[in-house]
């Protein structure tokens, strides 16, 4: 099992490293999908910040101008994991996230990267009867060795997610410590327009993990994954002390009611252009 694991990890790293050699100059010309809801690029005040590549309507890569890339990997047409390649002038920095189905409604998510390839951070995603992510548990930090998997540190938190069963959009996320004390609660509000990634195919169990992993982000490259039906307009957070803060997003739309420009009250005058 160990040999297979390390073989898989190294094979993935070498593969995406090879891809990176051909990707660094891809941003010179944005390749438009021509499909509303499948973004081709994000621009910050007119400057390219990320470009997107697809296989059909399945997202396959997010490329940054510096060469850093996030690769969405598939096996037999099914999403299987994420690989990261570093900026073009950086040798270290390859990483990976593997998704393994462990039960009818559970997935194990294992993530790690260089330089400590034998160390994994592991979470479990549990789905409800509608196939929507309901709970994400950080189970701990593990080291893979000759004797299998050894736990180095116990997980210390979990999150409960609430989705609208009709729109399948995230409405609430509550993060607790392992004694079930509430650490922070997030609530989410949306517009009524078509979502900026609404024609992009991504599994809900990936999206649930993504929302948990990037809950503190306001970078649109990560936040846009909330826009699978409509578009996020407000995220409110409340911590265990009762302190409340919020982030708001506004948009300009094209003739088909898809967002083409995004604004955030935390971006200090920056506007993000969305190209399809």
Segments (PLM) and residue ranges:
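Initiator methionine at the very start of the polypeptide chain
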Residues: 1-2, 32
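Bacterial N-terminal signal peptides that target proteins for export
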Residues: 2-11
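Hydrophobic helical h-region of N-terminal Sec-dependent signal peptides
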Residues: 10-18
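C-terminal motif of bacterial Sec signal peptides marking the signal peptidase cleavage site
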Residues: 20-23
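Buried hydrophobic residues that stabilize the cores of well-folded domains
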Residues: 26-276
């Amino acid at each position: 099992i160990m040999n297979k694991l390390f073989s898989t990890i190294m094979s993935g790293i070498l593969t995406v490293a090879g891809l990176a050699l051909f990707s660094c100059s891809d941003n010179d010309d944005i390749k438009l999908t021509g499909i509303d809801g499948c973004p081709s690029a994000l621009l910050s005040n007119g400057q390219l910040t990320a470009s997107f590549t697809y296989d059909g309507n399945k997202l396959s890569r997010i490329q940054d101008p510096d060469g850093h890339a996030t690769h969405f990997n598939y096996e037999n047409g099914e999403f299987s994991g994420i690989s990261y390649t570093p900026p073009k002038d950086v040798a270290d920095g390859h990483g990976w996230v593997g998704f393994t189905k462990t039960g009818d409604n559970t997935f194990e998510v294992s993530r790690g990267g260089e330089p400590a390839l034998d160390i994994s951070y592991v979470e479990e995603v549990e789905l409800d009867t509608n196939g929507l992510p309901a709970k994400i548990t950080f189970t701990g930090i593990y080291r893979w060795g000759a004797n299998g998997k050894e736990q180095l540190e116990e997980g210390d938190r979990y999150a409960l997610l609430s989705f609208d069963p009709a729109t399948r959009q995230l409405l609430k996320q509550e993060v607790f410590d392992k004694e079930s004390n509430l650490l922070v609660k997030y609530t989410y509000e949306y517009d009524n327009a078509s979502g900026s990634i609404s024609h992009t195919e991504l599994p809900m169990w990936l999206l649930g993990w993504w929302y948990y992993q990037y809950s503190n982000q306001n970078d649109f490259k990560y936040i846009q994954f909330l826009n699978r039906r409509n578009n996020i307009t407000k995220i409110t957070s409340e911590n265990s002390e009762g302190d409340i803060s919020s982030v708001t997003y506004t948009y300009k739309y094209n003739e088909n009611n898809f967002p083409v420009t995004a604004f955030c009250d935390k971006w200090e005058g920056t506007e993000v252009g969305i190209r399809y």
